[in-house]
A protein has these predicted regions:
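Secondary-structure boundary elements
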Residues: 125-127, 213-225, 305-313, 380-382
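Extended, low-hydrophobicity, Ser/Thr/Pro/Gly-biased non-transmembrane segments
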Residues: 3-5, 9-10, 21-28, 37-39, ...
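Juxtacatalytic substrate-recognition/specificity segment
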Residues: 176-291
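Zinc-dependent metallopeptidase catalytic helix centered on the HExxH motif
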Residues: 252-338
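Ligand-binding face of N-terminal immunoglobulin V-set domains in extracellular IgSF glycoproteins
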Residues: 34
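Beta/coil-rich, acidic/histidine-enriched accessory regions frequently appended to metallopeptidases
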Residues: 1-29, 37, 41-49, 71-73, ...
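Acidic/polar loop patches that form or flank catalytic/metal-binding clefts of enzymes
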Residues: 224-227, 284-286, 309-320, 324, ...
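Active-site-proximal alpha-helical
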Residues: 24, 215, 293, 298, ...
Length: 554
């Protein structure tokens, strides 16, 4: 690497309430051109004595100096899918490394076995002096050198990933040590956390400890491979009254948490899984397509399976059941894959060519965990639900290969499985999950999913429309009962009907609607044409009125 020591000096910005001023200094630069990755920084007011220009992802600098200096400001607190991305206040500061740090591209893409021959320091001293100087103001940061300074010497790619993904959190916290064997787990919670009281605090501590112990066992952590973890439970944002996501790294997780919400337990479990996987499997290869879908699929699979370790009373109160969560995911998968095949028949091993954020979200958090579940059930004669992760751990010193993984797990079935589900669009056959599906909740569950999909796609598709499933009522049910409607073919129709009457009803209603409006099921714009196009809306409404009035069949 053609760089010397790197230092970030972080201060409070004078321009906006939740902005930070960053001064980056890189010593002994031996390059004439420097390329810094902007990533998720909301950057503005860049100052540099060297010539530079920017595009959407990078800052390009024509460097002439031995010691390079760049000053810039970043905005903290943008709203995302899990809440507000950080917060800056007097009692709490929390944000993710990648929200404030600009690093050279060569560092972020270096090989797993390389180490930087320099130090990387982040100094928050001035920031804390500007906002709060009380003695009991805690700092929870990675690579902690002192209270308000982070310093990593000889960083590997895994260390840089931790620096970028981790939370940097400061504030007033209570602290509990959950575990000391094979590494320490520290739990911090905001003193002003409205979700905690003296009644449920002990229950919270016991159950978070149970999840951590589950992952210590799963990843085979022992005295030769110790693992530390800091979990910070934040209060809600005072300004927006929304959740705060501070960051999620290898050793430090920070987010708002309500122990009475199942989704919060799932997200915490998901983040703890990533923490352990990043600790044990340090290679960059697991974070790149076409392998990333497997990593996220495992995280979503285990976010639910690990919750089986919670206390019985808490699981009953929050309706936490692993197979039921898999059934909900499978229902979502069937619904969207069959409703919009041109959008959602996504091939996992083509992950690297997918440009749509919404499609990636669907692959990672709906389809991928089902593929993991399917794989674990194919050869599950001995009841082992962990064959994939055990293979990865046992072969962590070897170069990772999807082909080797699947041949090891499936043997002679591998080629057939790969052609159908990894390189093809065959429907994943998990029909037995119907046993765990509550049919009366299907429409409500899918209505929630329609909203989630809308949040995924609206940023890239201005005309993406959320389908209001409340409009599919008894009138349409009467029309469906008069017709023999196939969901693509007779076999699939029978499977769907047996799996869920409500799912079958919704899919058949969509098929009737597309037929009436003469829109192909393969049309890439089918959602807009059926739900927004004024001519088709009129045709559909007239059809409903006429069908009920005359009881005619179409």
């Amino acid at each position: 690497m053609e760089y010397g020591d790197i230092k970030f000096l972080v201060r409070k910005s004078l321009n906006k309430e939740e902005s930070l001023n960053i001064r980056l200094k890189i010593k002994d630069v031996n390059l004439r051109e420097i390329q810094l990755y902007k990533g998720k920084t909301k950057i503005k007011n860049i100052k540099c004595k060297e010539d530079f220009y920017c595009d959407s992802n990078f800052i390009y600098i024509k460097n002439k100096s031995r010691d390079f200096i760049l000053e810039y400001e970043v905005l903290i607190g943008s709203l995302g899918k899990h809440g507000k991305g950080g917060e800056i206040g007097e009692d709490l500061i929390s944000f993710m490394g990648e929200q404030i740090l600009l690093l050279p591209v060569e560092m972020l893409t270096m090989s797993d076995d390389l180490k930087l021959n320099c130090s990387l320091e982040i100094d928050f001293t001035k920031l804390i002096e500007d906002l709060n100087s009380e003695d009991d103001y805690k700092s929870i940061i990675p690579f902690k050198e002192n209270d308000f300074k982070s310093k990593c010497i000889g960083a590997t790619w895994s260390d840089l990933y931790e620096i970028m993904k981790s939370s940097y959190t400061f504030g007033f916290f209570e602290e509990v040590v959950l575990k000391k064997e094979y590494g320490e787990v520290h739990l911090y919670y905001s003193i002003e956390n409205e979700f905690l009281n003296t009644i449920n605090k002990e229950e919270l501590i016991r159950n978070i400890k149970s999840i951590c112990e589950y992952y210590y066992d799963l990843f085979k952590i022992d005295f030769l491979n110790k693992k530390d973890l800091n979990i910070v439970l934040l209060r809600k944002s005072k300004n927006e009254n929304s959740y705060i996501l501070g960051g999620s790294g290898k050793n430090l997780i920070s987010a708002t948490f309500d122990m009475n919400k199942k989704r919060d337990w799932q997200l915490l479990s998901h983040r703890i899984f990533h923490s352990f996987m990043d600790h044990v499997l340090k290679s960059r290869v697991y974070h790149l397509p076409p392998n990333l879908w497997l990593t996220e699929g495992l995280a979503t699979y285990y976010e639910n399976l690990a919750l089986e370790s919670l206390e019985k009373e808490l699981k009953e109160r929050l309706d936490i059941k692993f197979k039921k969560e898999m059934a909900i995911l499978y229902t979502r998968y069937l619904y969207m894959t069959l409703k919009e095949p041109s959008r959602f028949k996504i091939i996992p091993m083509e992950e690297g060519s997918i440009r749509s954020h919404g499609k990636i979200e669907f692959l990672h958090y709906t389809k991928a965990p089902l593929l993991v579940y399917f794989l674990e059930t194919l050869n599950n004669s001995c009841g082992n639900k962990n064959e994939i992760i055990e293979y990865l751990i046992n072969n962590k010193e070897k170069s990772f290969s999807m082909q080797n993984l699947f041949y090891n797990l499936l043997g002679f079935q591998c080629d057939s499985f790969a052609s159908k589900y990894l390189f093809g669009n065959s429907i994943i056959p998990l029909w037995d999950l119907k046993e765990y599906l509550d049919n009366k909740d299907v429409i409500c569950t899918l209505k929630e999913y329609e909203y989630i999909l809308w949040t995924w796609f609206i940023g890239e598709e201005e005309n993406y429309i959320e389908d209001d499933l409340r409009e599919y009522n008894k009138k349409i049910e009467e029309i469906i009962s008069c017709r023999n409607i196939n969901i693509y073919n007779a076999y699939l129709t029978k499977q769907i009907e047996d799996y869920s009457k409500e799912l079958s009803f919704l899919l058949k209603a969509w098929i009737i609607r597309s037929n009436v409006c003469n829109v192909s099921s393969q049309d890439e714009n089918i959602r807009y044409k059926l739900l927004k196009d004024k001519v088709n809306l009129r045709i559909w409404n007239e059809f409903l009125e006429q069908s009920i009035k005359n009881k005619v069949n179409i």
